[in-house]
C-alpha cells in the first residue's frame, strides 16, 4: 500500500518499516471491510479485529475511521496517476495518448474493482473528499492529455465519465482485452468524440 501518501490531516505516517507494515495492515483490513460491508457498517473495532491488531494501534496512525478512508483514496489517486503516466509516456500523438489513457483506466477498473467502488463510495462518505479526488484527476488529465486546449477542463471531465462508464460496461460484460480495445476505438472514432 506504499503509494507515496505523504501528508493527510488525521493521519500519522510512520517513520519505520515496521510501523508502515502495521499501518498498511490496518488499511488493508479497512479496505476489505469498506468494500464488502460499507463504510457506515464498519467500525474501528471491526477493522482492528480483521487486522488482528489492538484498537490502540489504530489510533497511533489514524485519528478517525474517515481518516483511513482518506488514506485509501490518496493511495488510489497516487497509484492511478503514476500508472497513467507510465501508460501514456510512450505516445506523443494526442489521440493515442487519450486512447491509452481510457484503455488504462478501463483496465484499472476491471482489475481493481475494490478501488473503483471505494473511490465512488466516497461521495456518500465525504462529498469534499469525492470532489477533491475527481478535481485532482481532472487537473492532472488537463495537462497530460489535452495540453493548452481551451476546452481542456470540459474534455477532461468528459474523458473521466466515458472511462468510468466504459469500465463498468467491461466489468458487466466480462470483456476481453481485445473487446475493450474495440469498444474504446468505437467511442474515440465515432461522431461522439
Annotated model-derived regions:
Residues 29, 33, 104, 108, ...:
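Amphipathic alpha-helical interface segments
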Residues 1-21:
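N-terminal intrinsically disordered/low-complexity leader segments
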Residues 71, 85-111, 181:
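Hydrophobic alpha-helical connector segments
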Residues 20-32, 78, 83-85, 130-132:
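A short, Lys/Arg-enriched amphipathic alpha-helix from helix-turn-helix/homeodomain DNA-binding modules
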Residues 25, 29, 33-67, 71:
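Helix-turn-helix
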Residues 62, 69-79, 83, 119, ...:
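Alpha-helical DNA-contacting segments of helix-turn-helix folds
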Residues 78-81, 100, 124-157:
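Amphipathic alpha-helical packing segments from all-alpha helical-bundle domains
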Residues 116-121, 128, 145-191:
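Hydrophobic/aromatic-rich alpha-helical bundle segments in the mid-to-C-terminal region
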